[in-house]
Amino acid sequence: FIAAGGYAINDYFDTKIDLLNRPNRQIVGRTITKRTASWIHHITTAIGVLLGLFVSWKLKSLSLCFIFLMTPGLLWFYSASYKRMPFLGNFIISLCTALAPILIALANGEVLQTNYSPELLMQTPILPTIYTWILGFSGFAFILSMIRETIKDMEDEYGDKENECRTLPVVFGISKTKWILYSYIVLFIALLIWSYVSFIQDFALFKTIDEFYSLR
């Protein structure tokens, strides 16, 4: 729901840009009014935050509560101003993407600590292992999102330039932006190889999980 609200408010602020970059696919301003898009944002965001706060309350997790309250604000300011700045806009949206796996890690961590004794959890590195793997997934999600957002900026250069958005292609040009994109791709591939050699090859996660549940 929070992501849906983020898409709605992004389209609300991007009506002029979308009119230039993708006039045939524009929804806000043609299919629905900006006022309707604003209401969609308010309603879906409110539902998402309330559901998130309910889950946070049930799990007694302040970290989850903070994330559910912070994310809508980041998405709003991203759409209103941050996306018009080089690097910062892409960083914000990639951070929000990377938070999705972290939510799962935090929730599962709370469940494990609630249902198992601290002594049992200390006998195996189950929680650190789960957090390490989830952070790995979040890192890959972050880099992939940076790649995606950079490609989108390159596709939207014309409309962004006409509306005075200082995205990477507008500030540095398409040629230099391509090299930034290539660096993200090389980093992603390098981390993928390193992760396989360091973690996946010996199936350490599965061994840790088996050891943990054998102690029950």
What is the role of each PLM region?
Residues T15-F68, E164-F203:
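Multi-pass membrane catalytic core of lipid/isoprenoid biosynthesis enzymes
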Residues T45, A80, A98-P101, V111-R216:
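C-terminal membrane-associated helical module and adjoining short loops/tails
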Residues F1-F13, G48-V49, L62-W76, P125-I151:
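Membrane-embedded alpha-helical segments that form the functional core of polytopic membrane enzymes
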Residues V28-P118:
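Intramembrane alpha-helical segments
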Residues F1-V28, T36, L144-L168:
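Acidic (Asp/Glu-rich) catalytic motifs at the cytosolic membrane interface
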